[in-house]
From Swiss-Prot:
Source species: Bacillus subtilis (strain 168)
Protein name, per record: Uncharacterized protein YvrJ
Stored InterPro entries: YvrJ (IPR024419)
Pfam families to which the protein is assigned, alphabetical: YvrJ
Induction of synthesis: Positively regulated by SigO and its coactivator RsoA.
Length: 112
């Protein structure tokens, strides 16, 4: 990703240098946060769902009219811990489902 990917009209910062002018302000993000971790995530935009894949396993997130620019902005606002939490939830979703099934079976077995 380049700086142009993160630059948009909503990312323009008013300062005394560019006040009253339409000067473009580029935001520079630490490469270790965005370039390394966002390569593992791929976002696809649909009309009512966003599909996020992590290492070839994916899930749908019910988000209305989500644009990749807004998703990247939210990741930037929330920070690195939120990005890691999203990654872990996506990676371990199947294991959590298996754990819930095993807990339900254990609960049913304990009732007998």
């Amino acid at each position: 990703m380049t700086v142009k990917d993160f630059d948009s009209p909503s990312n323009r910062l008013p300062t005394k240098l560019n006040e009253g002018k339409q000067k473009k302000v580029n935001y520079y993000f630490p490469p270790s946060v965005f370039q390394n971790t966002l390569q593992q995530f791929t976002f696809y935009r649909f009309s009512s769902l966003t599909y996020m894949t992590a290492e070839k396993e994916g899930r749908y997130f019910p988000m209305d009219q989500v644009f990749i620019e807004e998703v990247v902005k939210q990741i930037g606002n929330l920070g690195f811990p939120a990005l890691i939490a999203m990654y872990l939830l996506t990676r371990f979703e199947k294991k959590f489902d298996q754990l819930i099934e095993l807990m339900t079976e254990l609960k049913d077995h304990a009732k007998k």
